[in-house]
Amino acid sequence: MAPTVMASSATSVAPFQGLKSTAGLPVSRRSTNSGFGNVSNGGRIKCMQVWPIEGIKKFETLSYLPPLTVEDLLKQIEYLLRSKWVPCLEFSKVGFVYRENHRSPGYYDGRYWTMWKLPMFGCTDATQVLKELEEAKKAYPDAFVRIIGFDNVRQVQLISFIAYKPPGCEESGGN
């Protein structure tokens, strides 16, 4: 017996004709009088400055700002505390990453700083952190001191900024 093949009664689908024009979509419509025309800021901006490539090293989060005043430090620390982060102080004689013994990255290349005491778990007052900063500055006047904010839930460092630069440090711009 020969097998019988039954013709399918399904409807046929039109062949693919290519992508439709998106001109009818609201995203692609452009108004000719939107006011943007040929946008260019190249000729109008004259106040933008470039960070010098020599003489002033860049540090951490707030490197491009002038040195922080005590009021600025208090505001940053209060933000850190409001965000429920744990403040920690770290210090180092060399305030930047360097490699003196090997070409590849390693533990002793300046990425890891020495922690000042323990993280300040439970700290709720920014002035407590400033007191610790003053103690660190007194104990190590020729070291950089940074404040970091640690999230103990996610176990990550979320903010880090230099709070003190040693005097006479020309590559840091002084303090």
From Swiss-Prot:
Protein family: Belongs to the RuBisCO small chain family.
Record keywords, A-Z: Calvin cycle, Carbon dioxide fixation, Chloroplast, Photorespiration, Photosynthesis, Plastid, Transit peptide
Main localization, broad class: plastid
Biological processes annotated in GO: photorespiration; reductive pentose-phosphate cycle
Protein name per its UniProtKB record: Ribulose bisphosphate carboxylase small subunit, chloroplastic 2
Span of chain positions assigned to the transit peptide in the UniProt entry: 1-46
Coiled coil: none
GO molecular function: ribulose-bisphosphate carboxylase activity
Remaining remarks: The basic functional RuBisCO is composed of a large chain homodimer in a 'head-to-tail' conformation. In form I RuBisCO this homodimer is arranged in a barrel-like tetramer with the small subunits forming a tetrameric 'cap' on each end of the 'barrel'.
Location of the protein in the cell: Plastid, Chloroplast
Function, as annotated: RuBisCO catalyzes two reactions: the carboxylation of D-ribulose 1,5-bisphosphate, the primary event in carbon dioxide fixation, as well as the oxidative fragmentation of the pentose substrate. Both reactions occur simultaneously and in competition at the same active site. Although the small subunit is not catalytic it is essential for maximal activity.
Subunit details: Heterohexadecamer of 8 large and 8 small subunits.
HAMAP family, sorted: RuBisCO_S_bact
One GO CC annotation: chloroplast
